[in-house]
């Protein structure tokens, strides 16, 4: 396993539409392991392949839960070729952040519930319903696979401001 570099806004790769994964290979399994290690190191709760410059339709997520003793129980999930089959008309709002837009958070409104189809690392296809933070996170990560960032869901003024800030920081870092 290896920690990979997370690409940061304004990197144009973040706007790429990721390619479907045809079959689960040992390379895809290693990529998934690297993605988990990278996500936990960051730390974050979700990571799309494109965020580590791998334009493949793969997502890792871990929405850990606290048990009765207050200990966090990891819940690692892999989604290969995920797609939203349906979304509720009801909306919910959560404050979102992104490992590719560090230290910037904004409230985003999304469908409160979604039905998702995806393939696991064993090549099995699943369908499941997601709600709450799980629905928000899966939508956020699937957006990445389609070249969409969470800032695309906020006002143009706020979006332009954050893009300008990160573009300026990238130029300063390049000097």
UniProtKB/Swiss-Prot annotation:
InterPro entries: Peptide_deformylase (IPR023635), Peptide_deformylase_sf (IPR036821). Coiled coil: none annotated. Binds 1 Fe(2+) ion. It catalyses: N-terminal N-formyl-L-methionyl-[peptide] + H2O = N-terminal L-methionyl-[peptide] + formate. GO terms for molecular function: metal ion binding; peptide deformylase activity. Keywords: Hydrolase, Iron, Metal-binding, Protein biosynthesis. One of its GO terms (biological process) is translation. Fe cation binds at residues 98, 140, 144. SUPFAM superfamilies: Peptide deformylase. Signal peptide: none annotated. The active site is at 141. The keyword Oxidoreductase does not apply. Its EC number is 3.5.1.88. CDD domains: Pep_deformylase. It is an enzyme of class 3 (hydrolase). Belongs to the polypeptide deformylase family. Removes the formyl group from the N-terminal Met of newly synthesized proteins. Requires at least a dipeptide for an efficient rate of reaction. N-terminal L-methionine is a prerequisite for activity but the enzyme has broad specificity at other positions. This is Peptide deformylase. It comes from Nitrobacter hamburgensis (strain DSM 10229 / NCIMB 13809 / X14). The lineage of its organism: Bacteria, Pseudomonadati, Pseudomonadota, Alphaproteobacteria, Hyphomicrobiales.
């Amino acid at each position: 396993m290896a920690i990979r570099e997370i690409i940061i806004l304004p990197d144009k790769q973040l706007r790429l539409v990721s390619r479907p994964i045809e079959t689960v290979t040992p390379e895809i399994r290693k990529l998934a392991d690297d993605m988990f290690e990278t996500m936990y190191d960051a730390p974050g709760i979700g990571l799309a392949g494109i965020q580590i410059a791998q334009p493949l339709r793969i997502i890792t997520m871990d929405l850990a839960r606290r048990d009765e003793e207050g200990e966090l129980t990891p819940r690692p999930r892999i989604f290969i070729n995920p797609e939203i089959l349906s979304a509720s008309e009801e909306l919910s709002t959560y404050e979102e952040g992104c490992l590719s837009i560090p230290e910037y958070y904004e409230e985003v409104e999304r469908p409160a519930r979604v039905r998702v189809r995806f393939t696991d690392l064993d090549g099995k296809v699943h369908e499941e319903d997601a709600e709450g933070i799980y629905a928000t996170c899966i939508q956020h990560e699937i957006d990445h696979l389609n070249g969409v960032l969470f800032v695309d869901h906020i006002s143009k003024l706020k979006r332009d401001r954050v893009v300008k800030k990160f573009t300026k920081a990238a130029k300063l870092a390049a000097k």
